[in-house]
UniProtKB/Swiss-Prot annotation:
This is NADH-ubiquinone oxidoreductase chain 3. The chain crosses the membrane at residues 4-24, 55-75, 86-106. InterPro entries: NADH_UbQ/plastoQ_OxRdtase_su3, NDAH_ubi_oxred_su3_sf. It comes from Baiomys taylori (Northern pygmy mouse). Core subunit of the mitochondrial membrane respiratory chain NADH dehydrogenase (Complex I) which catalyzes electron transfer from NADH through the respiratory chain, using ubiquinone as an electron acceptor. Essential for the catalytic activity of complex I. Core subunit of respiratory chain NADH dehydrogenase (Complex I) which is composed of 45 different subunits. Interacts with TMEM186. Interacts with TMEM242. Gene3D superfamilies: NADH:ubiquinone/plastoquinone oxidoreductase, chain 3. It catalyses: a ubiquinone + NADH + 5 H(+)(in) = a ubiquinol + NAD(+) + 4 H(+)(out). It is a multi-pass membrane protein. Belongs to the complex I subunit 3 family. It is an enzyme of class 7 (translocase).
């Protein structure tokens, strides 16, 4: 009974927050909110310039591999655990998945700037 109450309160609160987040910004839309802000000055050119999609993909790839390093950093401390086999298997699976992703990215020429 207690668990059902906690789950229902969480669902009600999260639904309320989502509805308010979608409903509130639509109340007062005017042009000043839509303009880009640059230190109080009018922008000299368009602030909404497109950027290279290749740069975006390389940046996302960098973030993924940076996350891999962050996930593998606790391994020296985990070596002290009594069940080292599970820890090493998990680390091997993580590195294998990311290596396969890098190989796929490389074969699809996602890491090259020129097309």
């Amino acid at each position: 009974m207690n668990m059902i109450m906690v789950i229902s309160v969480n669902i009600i609160l999260s639904s309320t927050l989502i509805l308010v987040a979608f409903w509130l910004p639509q109340l007062n839309i005017y042009t000043e909110k839509a303009n880009p802000y640059e230190c109080g000055f009018d922008p000299m050119s368009s602030a909404r310039l497109p950027f290279s999609m290749k740069f975006f993909l390389v940046a996302i790839t960098f973030l993924l591999f940076d996350l891999e390093i962050a996930l593998l950093l606790p391994i020296p401390w985990a070596i002290q655990m009594p069940d080292m086999k599970t820890m090493m298997l998990t680390a091997f699976i993580l590195v294998s998945i990311l290596a396969l992703g890098l190989a796929y990215e490389w074969t699809q020429k996602g890491l090259e700037w020129t097309e």
